[in-house]
């Protein structure tokens, strides 16, 4: 008998908070006893994707296909064959879209399964097949109290079966340091106060608050005329946001940097005087990354960011669509006098609660 099977939509072919979180979970899993026999099925990843876990004992099945339908058929067949041959102790379903298939097979074979959930994919009432798959699961893992509460209320889930497995930050990759002279020159920020957001600019999810922060700039500029707003990320919403900067007359202050590789993110965080993302998040790994680099943060006040910000202990929480409140929080941060602006304190508070050792301990407890 093998210990576990995992199913995910994709991990390596897309960048984003969910993908980053799953990689952290797998990395922690690899440090646990008997993990080497596990199998991972990836619906949308191809064999040539950059996989840092290759040759570490886990077997990966890449099922990306030019036809989405054929890819799902291949997943269904290969997953069933693996269940019949190896009879795992437990299946971990990494996305609600895969939960109905997981339920169908696991209930028939009397194999317990766990569903991993993250954010807005489970905040609203789900189709019956997905709702029933959650209700029938042996357990559900999610990343925040906020997602747990919304999911349970919307889908009649017993909260007792839901465990919190929070996001964590890579303290070695995201650390304190000096501002990069290369980036200062690249973005022309030598004498500027810098606000930063890292987010996908997707028109289907305008809740990252980039437009709200842009609307806050005229007020901030009255006190800090040299302020710059650096937006890292790519997506189809960029033209709308660029048009908004011109409409408000702040296009000279906003820098759309596009995609930045993960290995270069820490230097970009350290360039900032404040990380600003007044959004609706299931959690928000980017807040942890910024704070681990010693950068103060602003989040929304109606979402899962309450956890990385420790209910306001280590950051500013504002109404996520209120540009004036965002401006006010920025004006409180930029002088750098508040306790929540002290880099060493901010990093220590963050790592104590959201370091990788915490994730491993929690994962071992749950498994």
Regions found by a protein language model. Give the residues of each.
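A short, well-ordered alpha-helix in the C-terminal region of glycosyltransferases
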Residues: 226, 339-353
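Short alpha-helical donor nucleotide-sugar binding micro-motif in glycosyltransferases
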Residues: 259-260, 267-272
């Amino acid at each position: 008998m093998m210990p576990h099977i995992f199913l995910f939509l994709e991990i390596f072919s897309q960048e984003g908070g969910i993908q980053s979180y799953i990689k952290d979970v797998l990395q922690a899993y690899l440090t646990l006893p008997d993990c080497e026999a596990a199998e991972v099925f990836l619906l949308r990843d191809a064999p040539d994707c950059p996989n840092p876990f290759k040759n570490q004992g886990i077997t990966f099945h890449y099922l990306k296909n030019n036809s989405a339908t054929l890819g799902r058929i291949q997943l269904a067949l290969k997953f069933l064959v693996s269940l019949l041959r190896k009879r795992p102790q437990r299946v971990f379903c990494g996305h609600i879209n895969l939960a109905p298939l997981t339920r169908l097979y696991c209930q028939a074979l009397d194999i317990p399964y766990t569903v991993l959930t993250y954010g807005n994919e489970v905040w609203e009432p789900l189709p019956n097949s997905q709702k029933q798959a959650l209700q029938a699961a042996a357990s559900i893992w999610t990343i925040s109290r906020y997602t747990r509460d919304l999911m349970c209320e919307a889908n009649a889930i017993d909260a007792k079966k839901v465990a919190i497995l929070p996001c964590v930050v890579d303290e070695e990759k995201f650390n304190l340091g000096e501002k990069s002279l290369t980036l200062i020159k690249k973005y022309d920020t030598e004498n500027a106060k810098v606000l930063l957001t890292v987010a996908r600019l997707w028109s289907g999810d305008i809740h990252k608050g980039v437009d709200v922060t842009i609307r806050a700039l005229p007020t901030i500029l009255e006190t800090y005329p040299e302020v710059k707003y650096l937006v890292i990320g790519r997506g189809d919403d960029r033209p709308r946001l660029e048009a908004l900067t011109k409409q408000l007359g702040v296009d000279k202050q906003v820098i759309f940097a596009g995609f930045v590789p993960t290995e270069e993110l820490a230097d970009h965080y350290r360039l900032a005087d404040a990380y600003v993302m007044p959004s609706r998040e299931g959690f928000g790994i980017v807040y942890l990354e910024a704070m681990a680099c010693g950068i103060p943060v602003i989040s929304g006040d109606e979402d899962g960011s309450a956890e990385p910000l420790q209910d306001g202990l280590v950051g500013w929480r504002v109404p996520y669509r209120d540009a004036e409140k965002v401006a006010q929080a920025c004006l409180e941060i930029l002088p750098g006098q508040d306790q929540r602006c002290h880099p060493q304190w901010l990093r220590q508070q963050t790592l104590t609660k959201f370091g990788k050792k915490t994730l491993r301990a929690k994962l071992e407890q749950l498994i």
